[in-house]
From Swiss-Prot:
Species, as recorded: Homo sapiens (Human)
The gene coding this protein: C7orf33
InterPro entries, per database record: DUF5548
Recorded superkingdom: Eukaryota
Descriptive protein name: Uncharacterized protein C7orf33
């Protein structure tokens, strides 16, 4: 699938949450199907998504771990590497955030395991859905849907690289106190 992105940037989180924050904004043409691959290096402890647009289907897949490929014969509960898709319909003009329903550790970071249920909420409170190491995030839209804008936010420590597989226009880093 050909990847086309109109813009990609890191900006300050619109919800003014404390701590180091990054935001990736990808503007997609209306009614088009696009796939965005974002690769991160470093430690990311929270990820949230803000979608605004017409009714449609928004899908997020993510892979965690420090290996290139997951071993299907491995006990996946021991490791952090696997790919889990989450999807939910969007409502016109409404902000939506992916929230995790998994257990949290002492640092309030969700440890993703196979079968972890993900959902969307219009509540502005942001939930964590990443493991300690987040390697790949993939966003996609079903064809024939209208999505005017989307926001993928990564909040954590030592996030050194954010790169789109096709183009990256205006990349910056914002740390909020």
């Amino acid at each position: 699938m050909q990847v086309e992105v109109q813009s990609l940037s890191l900006e300050e989180c619109p919800w003014r949450l404390p701590g180091p924050q990054c935001e990736c904004e990808a503007l997609l043409p209306s009614g088009a199907r696009r796939r965005i691959d974002l690769r991160l290096s470093g430690r990311a402890v929270a990820v949230w998504v803000h979608v605004r647009g017409g009714p449609g289907q928004f899908n997020l897949s993510y892979a965690t771990g420090r290996h290139k490929k997951p071993n299907p014969h491995q006990n996946m509960n021991r490791g952090m590497e696997f790919i889990a898709p989450v999807s939910a319909p969007t409502k016109s003009g409404a902000p939506w955030h992916f929230l995790s329903q998994g257990p949290t550790d002492a640092q309030r970071a969700v440890r993703i395991r196979p079968g972890t249920r993900m959902g969307l909420s219009s509540d502005p409170v942001v939930g964590t859905l990443s493991s300690s190491y987040l390697d790949l995030l993939t966003l996609s839209y079903k064809p024939g849907r209208t999505v005017t804008s989307s926001y993928l936010n990564v909040r954590g420590h030592e996030v050194r690289k954010l790169q789109n597989s096709v183009e990256a226009t205006r990349i910056s880093r914002t740390d909020s106190s």
